Amino acid sequence: MFCDCENFTELDVTGFDTGCVEDMSYMFYGCENLMNLDVTGFNTGCVTDMSSMFQRCENLMELNVTGFDTGCVTNMSWMFGECKNLMKVDVTGFNTGCVTDMSRMFYGCKNLIELDGSENIKYKYNIADTEDMFEGCEKLEI
């Protein structure tokens, strides 16, 4: 939807009706200059794919996705990958019970220091792929 919108520095999507959306993959991919993004009003109850949703949002420093209903999501690969200036993500409330792919979910988030709700990201028996999930997260202590 906003894939490769390199010139956006802020984006207000609080009024978007996302109640029937099943695929949010690549939604904000490559929004390299995006610094402010408010997705707190997103209804994600039907979403199954969040892969690369915020990938390469290189100037995003903080993201609050606490309101995301992730109970139906199966793919979270690269979700926050290559967000090199991302310092804080709040995933409190995440339900990863159906997720089968979390590969490179936080790959290359070299400035990530705070991952609130990380206890909700569980490696359950059904997760087939967690390869390089936190690769390059040099400052993160979980």
Residue map of PLM features:
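Negatively charged
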Residues: M1-I142
